[in-house]
Amino acid sequence: MIKDIFSIYNWDVVILYECTCDDIDYIIKALKEIKCPNKFIKEALDNLETCNLNIGLTYSNIALKSSIIIINKTSSFAQLINTISHEYYHLICHISRIFKIKDEEELAYLNGNLNMRSYKIVESLKREVDS
């Protein structure tokens, strides 16, 4: 598992890449730390315990301005990009809702900043998936 922890828009973000079944305890603990409701934790656990590839989850605690994004191992680099894009969209929606960001250009910059932030990690994962 690769961890990336940062703040953007005064919002704390933890992204866990390349998660497997071995990481479930850590993931559940991280979700509990940001006061994730038990209902979502159960749903996350049900998904993660399948040990399937290509699973992504995002949980945001709006009050804490904090999010956790989980990206399981993927079957291909294309699927990795798809999963990351999908989960980033959830994060962008959560941030934009709280900060009332409606300007498309500002949202596009937020998306770009997230992608630039993750570029080196994604690039290293591309080499791993391609080999």
Language model regions located:
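Amphipathic alpha-helical interaction segments
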Residues: 91, 95-99, 122
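Post-HExxH zinc-binding segment in Zn-dependent metallohydrolases
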Residues: 101-131
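Short His-Asn-centered micro-motif
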Residues: 71-74, 94, 112
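Non-catalytic terminal regions of proteins
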Residues: 1-49
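Active-site recognition of the HExxH zinc-binding catalytic motif
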Residues: 82-94
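Active-site scaffold of zinc-dependent metalloenzymes
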Residues: 31-78
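Disordered, low-complexity tails and leader-like regions
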Residues: 62-64, 85, 127-131
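Short, conserved micro-motifs enriched in small and acidic residues
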Residues: 78-79, 83, 102-106
